[in-house]
Regions:
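Transmembrane-helix bundle of Major Facilitator Superfamily
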Residues: 2-195
Length: 196
């Protein structure tokens, strides 16, 4: 992943490495749009937050959507890799804090932070692919991202339901794992995007 859109031509191996990092980031952002919905009942019960429950999902979607156009311009100014990695770190920070939330207001605020990172993960994935592959091949790569999106749409509610049905996993309340599960995958995406 070059620092600027112009310049280096990547080998097929480098493109595959970059693609794996981008697909991991896309999976995280897409998964978090659906994983929470199945766990809302458990979250509301723990926090007595019925009046605010819709904001748990809406905060993520709103900030993700609002931040998406900003990431393209910011990455033009500062480089694709650093801005994509900033989006990963922001998403991971939001994920960790969401899992550690002690009330509904904290959860909503940290979901908004998570959405700021998620917007960058979604937007920059397509920008970076546009930078590193020729126009003739972009459709194939966008198809891969469509498959990731489809997988996340199906897996999100299933994982959310699984985690929220567990009383505790490793001593942590089950629904909190819908956020903590992002951490190892996000760290892997950071390592992968640093490799090229």
């Amino acid at each position: 992943m070059s620092a600027s859109p112009q310049g280096k031509v990547h080998t097929h191996k480098e493109i595959l490495i970059i693609l794996s990092g981008l697909m991991t980031g896309m999976l995280l952002a897409a998964l978090d749009q659906t994983i929470v919905s199945a766990a809302l009942k458990s979250i509301v019960e723990e926090f007595n937050g019925l009046e605010h429950y819709t904001w748990v999902v809406t905060a993520y979607l709103l900030t993700s959507t609002a931040s998406t156009p900003l990431y393209g311009k910011i990455s033009d100014l500062y480089g694709r890799r650093i801005v994509f990695q900033f989006a990963i770190v922001t998403f991971l920070l939001g994920s960790f804090l969401a899992g550690a939330s002690t009330n509904m207001e904290q959860l909503i605020a940290t979901r908004a932070l998570q959405g700021l990172g998620g917007g960058g993960l979604m937007a920059l994935t397509f920008v970076i692919i546009g930078d590193i592959v020729p126009p003739r091949e972009r459709g194939r790569y966008q198809g891969y991202f469509g498959a990731v999106w489809g997988l996340a749409s199906v897996a999100g509610p299933l994982l959310g339901g699984f985690f929220s049905d567990q009383d505790k996993i490793l001593g942590i309340t089950g629904w909190r794992w819908i956020f903590y599960i992002n951490l190892p995958f996000g760290i892997a995406a950071l390592v992968i995007t640093s490799a090229v």
